[in-house]
Structures are given as structure tokens and as C-alpha cells.
């Protein structure tokens, strides 16, 4: 239901509908009552964000981190902090404010409930977590959403993110070029972005005519209760592995620390490639070879997409090119 539809049903102009819903004295009470009744019957809601945008008022944008089943992601995670800083800068450059929170969705209306309670004009989500279907259902009626994550076929919301498949492929190909034959994968596979990186890893393995071994695929997330158990499994199988593609830099650094504690030399005994290119990748010893994600460019596109959606313009998903950054670990 659009404002033009209400105008057609009421037999008035679109501008009259706009004035009536804004309680303008230029519209008589009888017409206001008619228009409000029609709007209520059809579930029409005034898009406050769009109105503010047209009036050039500052918008409040909420940055949410959807939870993933069984995973304790927090806003203190290094990647989220980096993305938050980039998004805050992009919003500030455009004169808008950032509201930061973590959410634990309980129903299919969690985004709308958040907007209603917190008075945010739009939502930026960092990753889909395990909430893709929830986000998809809400995006069918609520336009003010912009998502950093993996593009999913048929999804009604635009995403911005690195080409995760290509990034996983490039990381694995680099390990293969170094002569690695038994390359393990470490990452939380159910997350859409990580699953795409895993598929890129598999593609490179198969292209090299190497048989995929499921016993050296380790599903883990830094901060989860099972992370230490996964590290123990990796250490137990370390001698049969000569390379690791790790789906995040935080996981890669945790793995390198564990391996160095038991005397493994990196990269001569075991090469490691991460993903994200966080500052710690440069500072750690040995410095981490990784896949760079352009968080600054990504944040700018996320904000531009959100403002376009609020204004009612069409937006499209964007995939950024992943860059292999070669350092000391591989």
C-alpha cells in the first residue's frame, strides 16, 4: 500500500493524503478521518525516515549484529570494531548519527520492533548470522535495511561484501603454489560468508586434483565454547597438515599461537592464510598472509545503499574484489 493507492481509494490527490497524515490544518477533519481510516485498514505506515531525508534532517542509523546459533559474537570482536568505525565515519561524513547495539531476535518482527522502540530511521546489519530468513521476511515490507554479508540468490535485500568465494579460492591457491598438499579449513561453515569461503577452498582443492578430506575441516569460531576443543583436535592432527586456510584473522592468530606453543615453525612446517586483513595480521609474528577486505569502501557503499533505500530508490548488491596480501606466514 502506497500513498498513491490511498489517494485513489479516497478520491483525493496524493498531496492531500500527505497533508492529512501529517495532520495539516489545510485538510478538513472529515477528509482526514477518511484518509486515516483507509490507511489503518490497509496497514499503511508513514515512512518517517524518508520524510526526514527529504527534509534534509539528520537520520539515526542503527548498526546491528545478528546472532548466530550457538556462537557468541560480540561487538568487541576486532572485525566488528573495524567495520563499526568505518560505518560511523561514512555516516558522519553525510551528516547522520550511528546507534550501535547487539540484538537477539525473538520473532519475525524484531527489526521493526527495534525501529519502533529505538526510533532509528534505518538499519545496517553486519553479517546475516543465522537470521537470513528473518531478514528476508522483514525486507519485503521494510526498505530501510543495508547488509554487510554474502549475496544470497532471490533475497529481497541488497548486500555489500567481499567476493567470499573468490577470496577463499585465492587463499587456497596461494597455499597450493607454496607446495602444500594437505590443506585444512578452519571456520564456522553455517555463516553464509564463511560457507562461500569454504566453497572457494573446495574449488581450488578440486582444481588441483587433490581429494577433499573432511577430517581436516574444522568448524569453529573464536569465543565459542567449543573453540579450545577444536584447537586440540587440530593439534592432534597437525602432522598430517601442511597448510591452513582460516576463515578469519582472529581464528588464524589463535591457531598460530597454539601451534607455536608446541614448537611448530610457521611457515616452514605449516603455512597459514587468514581472512580480513585486520591490524593484528601485520603486527603478529610471523606476520599473517591474509585476504584483504576493504572495510572503508564497503562502509561507504553500505551507507549509500541505505540512504537510497530510505529515499525509495532501487539498490543492488555489490561484491568487492578480495586482495591476497602476502606476508610471512605463507
For every predicted segment, state its role:
Residues 182, 212-216, 265-271:
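Short acidic capping loops at alpha-helix termini that bridge into adjacent secondary structure
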Amino acid at each position: 500500500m502506497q500513498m498513491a493507492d490511498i489517494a485513489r481509494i479516497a478520491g483525493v490527490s496524493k498531496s492531500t493524503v500527505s497533508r492529512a497524515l501529517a495532520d495539516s490544518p489545510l485538510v478538513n477533519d472529515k477528509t482526514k478521518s477518511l484518509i486515516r481510516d483507509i490507511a489503518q485498514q490497509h496497514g499503511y505506515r508513514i515512512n518517517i525516515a524518508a520524510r526526514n531525508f527529504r527534509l534534509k534532517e539528520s537520520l539515526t542509523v542503527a548498526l546491528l549484529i545478528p546472532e548466530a546459533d550457538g556462537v557468541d559474537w560480540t561487538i568487541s570482536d576486532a572485525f566488528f570494531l573495524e567495520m563499526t568505525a568505518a560505518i560511523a565515519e561514512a555516516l558522519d561524513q553525510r551528516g547522520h548519527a550511528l546507534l550501535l547495539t547487539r540484538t537477539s531476535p525473538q520473532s519475525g518482527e524484531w527489526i521493526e520492533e527495534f525501529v519502533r522502540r529505538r526510533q532509528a530511521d534505518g538499519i545496517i546489519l553486519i553479517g546475516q548470522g543465522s537470521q537470513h530468513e528473518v531478514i528476508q521476511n522483514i525486507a519485503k515490507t521494510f526498505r530501510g535495511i543495508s547488509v554487510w554479508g554474502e549475496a544470497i540468490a532471490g533475497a529481497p535485500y541488497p548486500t555489500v561484501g567481499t567476493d567470499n568465494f573468490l577470496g577463499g579460492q585465492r587463499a587456497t591457491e596461494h597455499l597450493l603454489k607454496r607446495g602444500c598438499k594437505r590443506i585444512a579449513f578452519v571456520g564456522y561453515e553455517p555463516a553464509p560468508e564463511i560457507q562461500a569461503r569454504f566453497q572457494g577452498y573446495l574449488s581450488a582443492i578440486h582444481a588441483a586434483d587433490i581429494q577433499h578430506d573432511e577430517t581436516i575441516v574444522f568448524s569453529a569460531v573464536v569465543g565459542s565454547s567449543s573453540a579450545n576443543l577444536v584447537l586440540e583436535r587440530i593439534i592432534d592432527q597437525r602432522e598430517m597438515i601442511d597448510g591452513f586456510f582460516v576463515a578469519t584473522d582472529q581464528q588464524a592468530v589463535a591457531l598460530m599461537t597454539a601451534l607455536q606453543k608446541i614448537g611448530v615453525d610457521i611457515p616452514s612446517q605449516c603455512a597459514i592464510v587468514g581472512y580480513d586483513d585486520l591490524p593484528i595480521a601485520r603486527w603478529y609474528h610471523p606476520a599473517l598472509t591474509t585476504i584483504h577486505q576493504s572495510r572503508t569502501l564497503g562502509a561507504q557503499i553500505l551507507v549509500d545503499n541505505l540512504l537510497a533505500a530510505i529515499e525509495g530508490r532501487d539498490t543492488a548488491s555489490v561484491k568487492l574484489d578480495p586482495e591476497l596480501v602476502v606476508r610471512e606466514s605463507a
